[in-house]
A protein has these predicted regions:
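Non-ligating segments of multi-cofactor redox enzymes
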Residues: 1-126
Length: 126
């Protein structure tokens, strides 16, 4: 890859794979693609987990329930420093936190409509 997308990313959120990760690894998750050396990528918020949750809900003929899909980072963080949810649901925790006076988005002035929201230090959650 030429890495021009890395230079253009306003968030510096792209990573370049310098190594070859294509070796046989019996422990690899078959649902997660492993990009070859020379490819730029960024976090997908575990899109494969979202797809699985959608497929499960569709097979069961129901809507996805809140919390049914959580990226691995949100699931693994014991401090709950990463909260994930539906911003379009005003009752969701993530939606309430997004409306907090502590909430801010990076590079919002560039018109990129960021969906990752950060909270400044302060009292409790939202």
């Amino acid at each position: 890859g030429c890495r021009f997308c890395m230079a253009a990313c306003p968030y510096n959120a792209k990573y370049f794979n310098w190594r070859l990760y294509q070796k046989e690894a019996p422990g690899q998750n078959p649902d997660v693609s492993v990009r070859p050396k020379g490819v730029v990528e960024k976090c997908t918020f575990c899109h494969h987990r979202l797809q699985k949750a959608r497929e499960r809900a569709l097979a069961e003929k129901r809507e996805m329930s809140p919390g049914e899909y959580v990226p691995a980072c949100g699931e693994a963080c014991p401090a709950r420093a990463i909260i994930f949810g539906d911003l379009s649901d005003p009752a969701s925790e993530v939606s309430r936190l997004a409306k907090s006076p502590r909430a801010f988005r990076l590079q919002e002035e560039l018109g990129t409509k960021p969906k990752v929201i950060y909270l400044t230090e302060g009292e409790g959650r939202g």
